[in-house]
Amino acid sequence: MNVADEIKLALADLAIPEKAAFFPRFFKSGKGEYAEGDQFIGVTVPDQRKIVKEYWKKIPLEELSELLRSEIHEHRHSALLILVTKFEKASESKDEIIKFYLAHKAYINNWDLVDNSCYKILGRHCFEANDNSVLETLSNEENLWSKRMAIVSTMYHVKRGEFEVMKKLVLKNLNHPHDLMHKANGWLLREMGNISEEELQQFLKAHYRDMPRTTLRYAIEKLDEDTRQDFLKGKI
């Protein structure tokens, strides 16, 4: 039995049947939904983190690949949490982890898988290398998850007061048809506003009339009520 198999068994021991029944509805894995066919065993994220703490040092990347290619959602999510930990703890070159992450992006195919890994790995790498070309490449792909990966990765930049790449990518996919992009764009704009309300309002004044309503609502959530209403009613 390899380490990946040990992790699968450990996760199975933590499975909660009620969660296994609920997660497919929550993560939209039904027929015709964005995560159609995804399978769940019902392991919560806090329980997955217990597994990560125990196994992140033990499992090599080649076995992590097996876990990340699994049809079971919690296997993939745990694999990504392990990869984040490996990246954060790495004392030498992290290029191998970046290559691994991008080589497996086809399996990073739901919003939680994207959001809980991309900015901590890809975003940090791009910020520290001062090279955002991979984010621009991802934002140009047709795949929904690649586009979301690109914009959410800029969270690392935004939290450090660097807004330009985020604004550029938001505008590139401002009117994407899927609400998961509308929400992601609004979320990142709101994060910018948490650091600089002036930057947020300046951006919104230039573009709010062109953005989806969901994006606007997410972006203005933390503004005072009068300002929110002015944006919603088109008075600015």
Predicted regions and their residues:
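Alpha-helical scaffold domains
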Residues: 1-236
